[in-house]
Amino acid sequence: MKNTSSSTTLTMNDTIAAIATPLGKGAISIIKISGHNALNILKQLTQKQDFTPRYAYVHDIFSNGVLLDKALVIYFKAPYSFTGEDVCEIQCHGSPLLAQNILQACLNLGARLAKAGEFSKKAFLNHKMDLSEIEASVQLILCEDESVLNALARQLKGELKIFIEEARGNLLKLLASSEVLIDYSEEDIPSDFLDGVSLNLEKQIASFKDLLDFSNAQKQRNKGHALSIVGKPNAGKSSLLNAMLLEERALVSDIKGTTRDTIEEVIELKGHKVRLIDTAGIRESADKIERLGIEKSLKSLENCDIILGVFDLSKPLEKEDFNLIDTLNRAKKPCIVVLNKNDLAPKLELEILKSYLKIPYTLLETNTLNSKACLKDLSQKISAFFPKLDTQNKLLLTSLAQKIALENAITELQNAKNHLETLELFSYHILSAIENLNLLTRPYETSQMLDSMFSEFCLGK
């Protein structure tokens, strides 16, 4: 796309424009314009001179006198906008070509094509949002976990900023008190003051650790729980995968060794992301390709969180079953022992199977041919292994930089607590903790750092 703007210097004073909606056809596309020239561009596009801020207008959109579309347009007057500048939105019909043509018209009238994250960067620099709120908005776009939506919404509302500001205010009071007492001799410092400061720090550290622990647990949850499906050939592993997906994803056949590699799919189970890994049947094989698949199956057990060990209930235990039992015992992972094909006459020696299993396990009899019933039973068994996270009234750190800053603040507060009787050192560590807290909401560093941070955001955001 050609930008005909005469300005070649990319500055925060430029008027920028971008398509804010995803690529592809849809009901509408949204073009955003931000900057001192935004309203003038909108006036030229619509051939309308008067716009009341925050009113929606349905109006024709023109480019060089040619009608492009009839669209919904809104003008947000500075500073009452997302970026803090004049912002105009054009909501046109959802043709990608049409949106591109309107965007090009904006560029022809003097706007510059926005860089990734530049709208958010303007909002940050104009003090419309702090870093925690901006990161929450990005994570809301990417979020795939229903349980974390509430925490992100609260962060977007500014509650993390309030929490950090309250903690910073508390530490500033402690710092002021210690600075006053530095000139006193140690014996003149009231013991109850030191006791009160120590208790204050313990509570502050505990609140920070709670935030950090919840954020780390949520990060692990976002990765998803890896669930490996293992068993001898033809035990019903692939049928089990298909039942959980409610579709034919893995090839099902009576021929042993049909699945020769791991197959991975992602599903949501009771609000949790689960990565299902269907593995090659575990048995002794002379086939080189199948052996590689079996080795990969065994490797997947090392990295999984839960194992589904599948046995054929309609057949007596044989060598391959005992090999599987040995594999489960050595893996030492949470295990659900699935007894498949319970629609057939049972021949598997269940008591012998139980006696050989040396790990905690949950037993489930099912029939993978009845997909819906199988999925319901499995969901109950699998979800019992998920850690219970209370997300109500919780705050969340969404970036590694925030977590490192909070970890450093905790370390400094612990150091301060250890140096309570040496007030110079105490003050030094309290001040360092405050500086780390500042990094959570407004990390004042260099323009290069800001460019790098916001470049991870999407266009139009």
From Swiss-Prot:
GO biological process: tRNA methylation; tRNA wobble uridine modification
Keywords tagged on the record: Cytoplasm, GTP-binding, Hydrolase, Magnesium, Metal-binding, Nucleotide-binding, Potassium, tRNA processing
Listed EC numbers: 3.6.-.-
Necessary cofactors: K(+)
A GO term from the CC aspect: cytosol
Main subcellular localisation: cytoplasm
Positions bound to (6S)-5-formyl-5,6,7,8-tetrahydrofolate: 32, 89, 128, 461
Domain TrmE-type G: 224-387
Cofactor note: Binds 1 potassium ion per subunit.
Residues annotated as binding GTP: 234-239, 253-259, 278-281
Residues noted as binding K(+) in the record, renumbered to the chain: 234, 253, 255, 258
Subcellular localization: Cytoplasm
Assembly behavior: Homodimer. Heterotetramer of two MnmE and two MnmG subunits.
Family to which the UniProt record says this protein belongs: Belongs to the TRAFAC class TrmE-Era-EngA-EngB-Septin-like GTPase superfamily. TrmE GTPase family.
Functional description taken from the UniProt entry: Exhibits a very high intrinsic GTPase hydrolysis rate. Involved in the addition of a carboxymethylaminomethyl (cmnm) group at the wobble position (U34) of certain tRNAs, forming tRNA-cmnm(5)s(2)U34.
Protein name: tRNA modification GTPase MnmE
Record organism: Helicobacter pylori (strain ATCC 700392 / 26695) (Campylobacter pylori)
